[in-house]
Structure formats: C-alpha cells, structure tokens
C-alpha cells in the first residue's frame, strides 16, 4: 500500500505547540507559537489559502490539550503567562470554537486538573476523554524558582536547579493518572478510570469504536515511553487496558516519541515525526534519572503504520525531521500542519497524506 503526500498552502505564520483539527471540509490551526492567531483552510477552495479565523480570546498558550467533538474544537489548559507573572504556569481554563459562527467561547467551569501536555479525543459526539498532563504545582513551582535566576550571572545555580528537577524518579512529577471525561453539553467532569500505566505527556491518541490507542509520549521530562497502549471503554467507563505491539518490537534502538503527528486512515494508525534524545533509554536503564543530560534532541522523519497487530516503518517524510505541530485526520486523509524543526523554527509547511 503506497503513501502519497501533497503539499497544501503554507500557514501565514509558523505554528508549533499549537492546536487545531478538521471540521467538515475545513482545517484549523493556530495558538502556540502564533500567539492568539487562529487560521482556517477550506479544502474545497485551497487556492484561496489559509485565512484568519476568529482570534483566540484567552491567554496565549503552548501545549494545550485539544480535540474536535460534535463539530466544534475544544481547547483545554496549556502553559501561558498569567497576570503579572514573568513565567508560564499551567492554565486551568477551557474554550470551545464554533466553526459555524466563527466564534470562541470560554467554558464556564474551571478544569478539575491541569491538562498541559495531556492527550484527549472525542469518545462520542457528546464525550471527551483525557489522558496524562503535567502536575500544576510541580510545574508552577519549578518555573517560579528558575525564573528568579539570571542565567547569565548565575549559570551554575541555574544548571544546579535544572539538574535537581530533572534527576527525580518518574513518580515524583505526579502527572495525572486519572482518566477524565468531559461532557460538553453541561460541562460535567468525572473520573472514569485510573490509568494502570505510567501517565504520559505529548502522546499520540487515536479513537476507533470504543477503543482509544495511546502512542508513546513522555514518562518524565526528556524520557519517552516505548509503549503503545489500548483502552477499552464501555458505557462511559474504562473497562479494560493493555499493552499493544510497539515500535521497539521491530526497531530495537527506538527511543520513543513525543510531539509526533498522528492520524487514522482506512483503519490504520499513522505516526509521523516526533522528537527524542538518542541514548536516553540506555542512560535511564543504567540508573541515570536525568536521562537526557548532555544529549541532543533528535527530530524524526519516520512514517510509521500500525494495523492493530504490528508496526511498519513505511517511509520517511523527508531528510529533516519535524515534531510539535497540529495533527488532523478524517479516516480518509491525514494532515500535518506546521510543527518545529531541529533548529527550533516554527514551520509553515502543511501536508496531506493519502494511502493508495
């Protein structure tokens, strides 16, 4: 089965660590590195290119959890600078974008926990499910302390604080272990299960029928998970979960991925790009909790396909890797919108992917 890529019109500005999705025949992308900007591309009129949609009304943010549900785009949490702060904190608000009227609305209820870096998906047109997310207090306290240090005047103190924070065991970061459910019609939040695996941030997430597949992500800052997990939901509750076939089964030097693009085409899960540190898994096995210390972040260009039984490295996107962009798919095509390259640049390139 061949994979074909098609270049789409470029975004007006680069978008990394942002949000977006596909609603009907329109693609949306924005926030993250583009601030409060939000853009729309009509797939039936691509010659017109991306146009400005309604600006996001809340605090500009990176790495929010986002998904399309009931033909609306929902955005939760993320990290942004509130009030008079000089550093980002975990945001506890949510917003919904109504594409029919091109309008954002803030959700009335405060989030039950921080969802910075969390993964979420629509389990049905009336329910959104959440996995993972940074702990608000842990994140905020660390950013508060490190913001007090002038790295040019006190580089050793800065490095020491980073080292102490990164050298903690996985459980010390207290990432969200609960599987949360959100009902948009009444903004009701509930815990529908506890994740039996180590919680992740920056995972790929795909929903099909009553099964949610969670693909890798981080287990702590700088260290990736090597697992693909499946979660079966029944009557709104987490019924069963297990480990699935993983990329490391066919690629023994695989380091795991975070910030990868993901989608579903013809009942196959597609994973593209992502970032990781070469040597981090070996360092962690040897007892180095600061597993990515001194290592260079690598940006992948691999295209992986999962048929539910095994993974296959089908091809490469190009010579350069990419991560931290917006993923969207509709079962027939997958879209790779923006992202970040190995130089840290926010990308404007957009692609569609088809399987022939």
Curated annotation (Swiss-Prot):
Record carries keyword Secreted: no
Give the Kelch repeat ranges. 72-125, 163-210, 288-331, 333-355
Q: What is this protein called?
A: Kelch domain-containing protein VC_1773
Q: Write the record's keywords in alphabetical order, separated by commas.
A: Kelch repeat, Repeat
Question: Record keywords: Lipid biosynthesis included?
Answer: no
**Which Pfam family is one of those matched by this entry?**
NANM
Database matches in Gene3D superfamilies: Kelch-type beta propeller
């Amino acid at each position: 089965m061949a994979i074909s890529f098609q270049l789409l019109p470029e975004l007006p500005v680069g978008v990394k660590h942002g949000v977006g999705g596909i609603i009907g025949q329109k693609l949306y992308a924005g926030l993250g590195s583009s601030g409060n900007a939000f853009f729309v591309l009509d797939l039936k009129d691509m010659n017109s290119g991306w146009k400005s949609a309604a600006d996001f009304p809340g605090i500009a943010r990176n790495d929010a959890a986002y998904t399309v549900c009931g033909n609306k785009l929902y955005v939760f949490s993320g990290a942004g600078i509130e009030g008079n702060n000089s550093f980002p904190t975990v945001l506890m608000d949510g917003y919904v974008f109504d594409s029919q009227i091109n309008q954002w609305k803030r959700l009335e209820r405060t989030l039950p926990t921080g969802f910075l870096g969390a993964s979420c998906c629509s389990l049905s047109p009336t329910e959104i499910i959440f996995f993972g997310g940074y702990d608000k207090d842990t994140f905020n306290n660390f950013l508060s302390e490190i913001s007090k240090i002038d790295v040019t005047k006190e580089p050793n103190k800065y490095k020491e604080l980073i080292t102490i924070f990164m050298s903690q065991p996985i459980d010390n970061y207290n990432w969200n272990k609960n599987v949360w459910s959100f009902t948009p019609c009444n903004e009701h939040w509930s815990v529908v299960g506890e994740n039996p695996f180590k919680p992740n941030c920056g995972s790929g997430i795909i929903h099909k029928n009553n099964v949610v597949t969670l693909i890798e992500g981080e287990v702590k800052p700088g260290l990736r998970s090597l697992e693909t997990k499946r979660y079966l939901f029944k009557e709104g509750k987490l019924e069963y979960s297990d480990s699935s076939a993983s990329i490391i089964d066919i690629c023994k030097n695989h380091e795991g991925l975070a910030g990868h693009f993901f989608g579903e085409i013809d009942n196959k899960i597609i994973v593209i790009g992502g970032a990781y540190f070469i040597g981090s898994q070996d360092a962690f096995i040897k007892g180095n909790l600061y597993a990515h210390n001194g290592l260079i972040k690598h940006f992948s260009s691999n295209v992986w396909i999962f048929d539910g039984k095994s993974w296959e490295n089908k091809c490469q996107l190009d010579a350069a890797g990419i991560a931290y962009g917006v993923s969207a798919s509709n079962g027939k095509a997958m879209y790779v919108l923006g992202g970040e390259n190995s130089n840290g640049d926010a990308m404007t390139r957009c692609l569609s992917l088809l399987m022939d």
